[in-house]
From Swiss-Prot:
GO cellular component: apoplast
Phylogenetic classification of the source organism: Eukaryota, Viridiplantae, Streptophyta, Embryophyta, Tracheophyta
Family membership noted in the UniProt record: Belongs to the UPF0540 family.
Biological-process GO terms, alphabetical: mucilage biosynthetic process; seed coat development
Name of the protein in question: UPF0540 protein At1g62060
């Protein structure tokens, strides 16, 4: 999208917001941002604030090793697998809602095989780590009416 199209769409969006916004005696933060609220909800707007967070972290590892010396001679095999998963969800409502969620996962694997009689060897390793973090906050700040005349 070039700059001209962006500016045109921005102007159209602002004009639509101005045309559709209703006048409210006490202007709330939400109204200043472009949404319109009925006059009856201005005093209890703090109850509508909320914050939500979701985090997921998953890990998987698989290791396999194999060594054979045939016909019908020595053979070796080794296998390793692992999986970890963490999921967190936090939803908070209220005046000072805070959200914090953390998640971490780790999986390690190691496999080894060895054969004698003319030698055969195999080795496999695997390591996985995963992390996730979510933060959030919601608070309606009090208006400062100092020095203002009604």
């Amino acid at each position: 999208m070039n700059a001209t199209k962006f500016v045109v769409l921005l102007v159209i969006g602002i004009l639509c917001a101005i045309v559709t916004a209703r006048q409210v005696e006490e202007v709330s933060k939400e109204t200043k941002l472009g949404t319109s609220l009925p006059k009856s909800t201005n005093k209890g707007i703090g109850a509508q604030l909320s914050a939500a967070g979701l985090t997921y972290s998953g890990s998987s590892v698989s290791s396999s090793a194999s060594a054979f010396n045939n016909p019908k001679g020595p053979g070796a095999s080794a296998s390793e697998s692992g999986y970890t998963s963490t999921i967190g969800q936090v939803i908070a409502k209220g005046r000072k809602a805070r959200v914090s969620s953390a998640s971490a996962s780790a999986a390690t694997g190691e496999a080894a095989a060895a054969v004698t009689r003319k030698a055969a060897a195999a080795r496999a390793k695997g390591k996985v780590a995963s992390a996730s973090r979510v933060k959030g906050s919601s608070e309606k700040k009090k208006k400062d009416h100092k020095g203002k005349k009604d």
